[in-house]
């Protein structure tokens, strides 16, 4: 589905804060294209692509053919091969039998809801593993980039890629600023890792 106006408006604001001058265009596709063109010029493609992905609407399963906004397809469906998920199996059966189950809306809602739960479990597991690693590496320096300026959060981009840390002595550094930090504390139960900017 197309992202909400509020999300696209925030995207434009965030990109402007990074120093890349962009404006809302006539529609969402034109706005995203405009942002990506400006990102290439500023050499901030990777960072701005992260912001564009964050602005997108969460994918969900639907009994209606809503297309794929991000890919620009008016008709779209997807399953993996070999079949690994229940959603893949349902779609494969529909394609094979050319019949849509009567309870397809309930099936889609159930799959979407449970997929979110599974994602949450995976993120929870990863965050605990990161916290365990950090607890064994207290005092070590790592390289991070700021990913949330409001909550003073950064993500490691070396040694243990993807580990999120709270920046204890954050002083308003710019989004995506890269810096060295020292791991100060890590709590496996709360999954909170605190680091100090060097």
Residue locations for each model-derived region?
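Structured C-terminal cores of nucleic-acid metabolism proteins
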Residues: 1-198
């Amino acid at each position: 589905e197309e992202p909400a106006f509020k999300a696209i408006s925030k995207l434009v604001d965030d990109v402007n804060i990074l120093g890349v001058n962009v404006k809302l265009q006539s529609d969402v596709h034109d706005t995203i294209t405009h942002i990506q063109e400006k990102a290439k010029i500023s050499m901030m493609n990777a960072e701005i692509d992260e912001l564009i992905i964050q602005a997108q609407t969460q994918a969900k399963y639907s009994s209606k053919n809503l297309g794929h906004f991000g890919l620009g397809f008016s008709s779209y469906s997807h399953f993996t091969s070999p079949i690994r998920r229940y959603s893949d199996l349902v779609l494969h059966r529909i394609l094979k039998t050319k019949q849509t189950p009567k309870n397809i809306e309930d099936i889609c809602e159930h799959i979407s809801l449970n997929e979110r739960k599974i994602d949450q479990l995976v993120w929870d597991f990863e965050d605990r593993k990161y916290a365990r690693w950090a607890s064994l590496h207290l005092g070590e320096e790592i390289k991070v980039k700021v990913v949330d300026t409001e909550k003073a959060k950064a993500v490691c981009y070396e040694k243990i890629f993807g580990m999120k840390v709270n920046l204890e002595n954050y002083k308003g550094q710019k989004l995506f600023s890269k810096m060295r930090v020292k791991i100060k504390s890590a709590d496996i139960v709360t999954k909170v890792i605190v680091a100090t900017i060097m």
